[in-house]
Curated annotation (Swiss-Prot):
GO terms for biological process: signal transduction. Its main location: membrane. One of its GO terms (molecular function) is G protein-coupled receptor activity. This is Olfactory receptor 7C2. It comes from Homo sapiens (Human). The keyword Cell membrane applies. Glycans are attached at residue 5. The lineage of its organism: Eukaryota, Metazoa, Chordata, Craniata, Vertebrata.
Length: 319
């Protein structure tokens, strides 16, 4: 088999979805709508939290960072896919593919860590309510988020740099709509043992460990909640319900993607699972957090009311 290194190859082909032009047009409209809803929804969450001083608490600080990470995570893959569908092109350069891999891993890991920080915040609030303001002080929250960013970037950089040492075969077709790291490794002609070790290491440290932290936090929360009154239980579960829904959606779809790709060759099923993971989950997060949260709904309503009043005032002045 002919061999070539990454500088000689230059381009990958993202096979993506259906070849039928009518189906491509339908998918373009669907994915563009989902992307816009994701961006607008998460931006509204960020603006709502930043504009309301009552929401300047650790929980909403982590939530605003999570919304920003979701915007970046979706923007890593979806715009390129939309451009490829629009232009009927499947090509992505090697540099573009590496860039996509780097940001995909970085923001995916950041999502993991921020979900863990939010679970820890709920754990402290419910299990140690009298010490909550002392433990979850602004300095600690800032350090936790900064540390999450640094760890995510370093883990992503480590995994991305190991791909640079690989040589690739002449078959440069990726059976996906973005540069999935595991699919890129399958195209390599050179030994990928080190790459697989690094990938498993990053997955365990930045995926499995955070999930274990979330499970531990909620085991402690449930243990504490069972000892309080029914009213206290309802309040605790309503507080944690949104976060649990997001965690279940994020890890459930993520696990579905990699189990389906590991058990069977890439198919429409695995592509659908990837769409759930990369697009549907970030799109639904703002709805889950806002619809189940009275404070968020109230603040969002006031924000939209101020925006409407400002618009009407501007129109009145111009007329």
């Amino acid at each position: 088999m002919e061999r070539g290194n990454q500088t000689e190859v230059g381009n990958f082909l993202l096979l993506g979805f259906a070849e039928d032009s009518d189906m491509q047009l339908l998918l373009h409209g669907l994915f563009l709508s989902m992307y816009l809803v994701t961006i607008i929804g998460n931006l509204l969450i960020i603006l709502t939290i930043s504009s309301d001083s009552h929401l300047h608490t650790p929980m909403y600080f982590f939530l605003s960072n999570l919304s920003f990470a979701d915007i970046c995570f979706t923007s890593t893959t979806v715009p390129k896919m939309l451009v490829n569908i629009q232009t009927q092109s499947k090509m992505i350069t090697f540099a573009g593919c590496l860039t996509q891999i780097f940001f995909f891993i970085a923001f995916g890991c950041l999502d993991n860590l921020l979900l863990t920080m939010t679970a820890y915040d709920r754990f402290v609030a419910i299990c140690y309510p009298l010490h909550y303001t002392v433990i979850m002080n602004p300095r600690l929250c800032g350090l936790l988020v900064l540390g999450s960013w640094c760890i995510s970037v370093m883990g992503s950089l480590l995994e991305t740099l190991t791909i640079l040492r690989l040589s690739f075969c002449t078959n440069m077709e990726i059976p996906h709509f973005f540069c999935d790291p595991s699919e890129v490794l399958k195209l390599a002609c050179s030994d990928t043992f080190i790459n697989n070790i690094v990938m498993y290491f990053v997955t365990i440290v930045l995926g499995v460990f955070p999930l274990c932290g979330i499970l531990f936090s909620y085991s402690q929360i449930f243990s504490s909640v069972l000892r309080v009154s029914a009213r206290g239980q309802h309040k605790a579960f309503s507080t944690c319900g949104s976060h649990l829904s997001v965690v279940s959606l994020f890890y459930g779809t993520g696990l579905g993607v990699y189990l389906s790709s590991a058990v069977t060759p890439p198919s429409r099923t695995s592509l659908a699972a990837s769409v759930m993971y990369t697009m549907v989950t970030p799109m639904l997060n703002p709805f889950i957090y806002s619809l189940r949260n009275k404070d968020m709904k109230g603040s969002l309503g006031r924000l939209l009311l101020r925006a409407t009043s400002l618009k009407e005032g501007t129109i009145a002045k111009l007329s």
